[in-house]
């Protein structure tokens, strides 16, 4: 990236809710991510080597889970893309709270990454937050970069 040019990042969130337990029809899993579009602002890499999004709210609930462990994962559909330019998705990480059940991590386009896990039911709707961070660099071409993230809440 040349001086005076900026790269903005937009991550689009998709939500998946899966139940794989043998009595899956009885399980009730709920997941909501807000906002659905996550924006990381642009800035001079010398003054801001790491760029952060506003906190993303993760609302989830697990019921009738028969004491099984639940798992929340995220995977990117590819690298960040702006026209012909790309930024490796592994340049994007997140800071999570509360810990537990949430944990910090780095995005991947090949392997779903664990965001949170816990035992049994989460009877009341519960909330966690994720703050996405981009390792900023002058090597990025100016542009608006986008990618889709798929969040999945599942039980074994």
Functional labels for PLM-detected ranges:
Residues 8-19:
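Bacterial N-terminal signal peptides
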Residues 1-4:
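N-terminal secretory signal peptides that target proteins for export/translocation
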Residues 24-156:
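N-terminal small/polar-rich segments of proteins
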